[in-house]
Amino acid sequence: MTQSLADMRREYTRDGLSEANAPSDPFSLFRQWFDDAVKTERLPVEPNAMTLATVDADGYPHCRILLLKGLDERGFTFFTNYESAKGRQLAANPRAAMTFFWPALERQVRIEGSVEKVTPEESDAYYQVRPLGSRLGAWASPQSRVIADRAELERLLAETERRFADQPPSCPEHWGGYRLLPQRIEFWQGRPSRLHDRLDYRRQDGGWSRERLAP
């Protein structure tokens, strides 16, 4: 390393997050922040990139970067192979956490809740708008399984291309969406001297409570 990790730091200088300007519904605030990120973050950064954390049957946590592909009043939707490691973990423990980080805005959002599969119709609707290569890849890749080498993956793809040479690929039964149903959403805004703003929303009596947390 060319620089000590202890010396790596930056000061946060953007506007704060106050209760007076924060809506009572966290979905409204998330949409506002997400729209800001889309306008502010520059490619190749993907504003819908998030860290998804799951826990396996033995209690070990796992995390990886995914892309958010849907948002409505029910929750946050992403898609994957149901037979992948994350799919098996969610089958054993259908709870997860998401983290979005938008460094240009000095903002972070943490989301926690239970997870459910979306309907086959929802999965198919998204699958059909994916690029052809991605649709074929959903069939070809035995996600999270050990393979011999890159050549094996390319062979599987070639077999899949031949299989669907005369017809468009349909959505595989082993592939589809999950929806995280949030119970807690925390908004973090970087502030000077590490005295950050944190607003914590929690499901309560059919609505949402909101509290400020110390940084």
UniProtKB/Swiss-Prot annotation:
Its cofactor is FMN. Its EC number is 1.4.3.5. Keywords: Flavoprotein, FMN, Oxidoreductase, Pyridoxine biosynthesis. Binds 1 FMN per subunit. It is an enzyme of class 1 (oxidoreductase). It catalyses: pyridoxamine 5'-phosphate + O2 + H2O = pyridoxal 5'-phosphate + H2O2 + NH4(+); pyridoxine 5'-phosphate + O2 = pyridoxal 5'-phosphate + H2O2. GO terms for molecular function: FMN binding; pyridoxamine phosphate oxidase activity. Pathway: Cofactor metabolism; pyridoxal 5'-phosphate salvage; pyridoxal 5'-phosphate from pyridoxamine 5'-phosphate: step 1/1; Cofactor metabolism; pyridoxal 5'-phosphate salvage; pyridoxal 5'-phosphate from pyridoxine 5'-phosphate: step 1/1. Belongs to the pyridoxamine 5'-phosphate oxidase family. Homodimer. This is Pyridoxine/pyridoxamine 5'-phosphate oxidase. The gene is pdxH.
